């Protein structure tokens, strides 16, 4: 009885992802190139494709460690985290956490202290760059709501929004590395952290929250926030209703101007819709 499609797919993955071709070899017809060699070619090609995807997603990490070390690290990552999807733009989300426990990196303590943080930022940046676009929430719809209804709002964030908290100033390191600015890199104080970052791909909104009718019209926005503002924004973007988000912000910092922060987030186009608390 011939194998099912699912069995063929599982055999193929075991070989390509794990190097175990025992189940896949009998399924191949002999040719000028031996079946095991052909599968080896496919496996090497797939691995090279994934390594390249990581290089594109983590350019600053690669520059910090060098191409040779990065490729070795990437291949060690592949051994534990093979791709589960063909959508390579999202591949490597587990890479920052992998770096935190990667033994060869621990031999370089200063680098090990901030490299995973830079990777976490680049992961959020990569997500923002490839997230689907969504029109910003029309503020006129909110203006028409009764005040009591506003408290029940749960905002729907822009798909590109990401929140990153790092122990080191990852944003400063990231900018300095990508700009090849050695002076800026030397001036960085690793004890400056923790830092709280918001990442967003912004379309049609300028830095004052007005419609962007000139320039690129769309760009990556990276903002360092104080912790209270960051926690409030993250709560709103995680689906916490406005009433609860306001209460949480007041409990964390009684002096935090949550209403002002909400107006700023709305003007910056950080939400694309809303629903009401059930």
Features from the language model and the residues they span:
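A broad, structure-centric signal for solvent-exposed, well-ordered loop/edge residues
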Residues: 23, 72, 170-173, 205, ...
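Hydrophobic packing positions characteristic
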Residues: 80-219, 223-228
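C-terminal structured interaction module
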Residues: 205-210, 214-278
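Preference for short coil/turn "hinge" residues that link or interrupt alpha-helices
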Residues: 57-58, 143, 148, 245, ...
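Residue-level signal for alpha-helical context at structural boundaries
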Residues: 30, 79, 92, 143, ...
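N-terminal, charged low-complexity regulatory/assembly segments
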Residues: 1-136
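Short loop/turn hinge sites at secondary-structure boundaries
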Residues: 18-19, 180, 239
């Amino acid at each position: 009885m011939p194998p099912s499609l699912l069995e063929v797919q599982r055999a193929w993955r075991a070989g390509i992802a794990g190097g175990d071709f025992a189940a896949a070899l009998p399924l191949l017809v002999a040719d000028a190139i031996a079946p095991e060699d052909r599968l080896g070619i496919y496996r090497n090609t797939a691995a090279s494709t994934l390594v390249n995807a990581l290089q594109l997603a983590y350019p600053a990490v690669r520059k910090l460690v060098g191409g040779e070390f990065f490729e070795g690290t990437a291949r060690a990552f592949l051994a534990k985290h093979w791709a589960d999807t063909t959508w390579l733009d999202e591949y490597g989300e587990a890479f920052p956490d992998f770096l935190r426990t990667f033994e060869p990196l621990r031999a370089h303590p200063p680098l090990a202290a901030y490299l995973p943080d830079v990777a976490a930022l680049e992961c959020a940046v990569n997500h923002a760059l490839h997230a689907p676009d969504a029109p910003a929430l029309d503020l006129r719809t909110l203006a028409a709501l009764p005040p009591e209804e506003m408290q029940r709002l749960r905002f729907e964030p822009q798909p590109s929004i990401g929140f990153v908290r790092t122990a080191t100033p990852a944003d400063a390191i990231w900018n300095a590395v990508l700009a090849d600015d050695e002076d800026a890199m030397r001036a960085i104080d690793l004890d400056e952290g923790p830092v709280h970052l918001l990442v967003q791909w912004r379309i049609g909104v300028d830095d004052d929250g007005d419609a962007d009718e000139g320039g690129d019209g769309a760009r990556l926005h990276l903002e360092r926030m104080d912790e209270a503002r960051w926690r409030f924004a993250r709560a709103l973007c995680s689906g916490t209703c406005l009433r609860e988000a306001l209460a949480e912000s007041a409990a964390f910092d009684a002096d935090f101007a949550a209403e002002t922060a909400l107006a700023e987030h709305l003007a910056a186009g950080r939400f694309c819709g809303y629903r009401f608390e059930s």
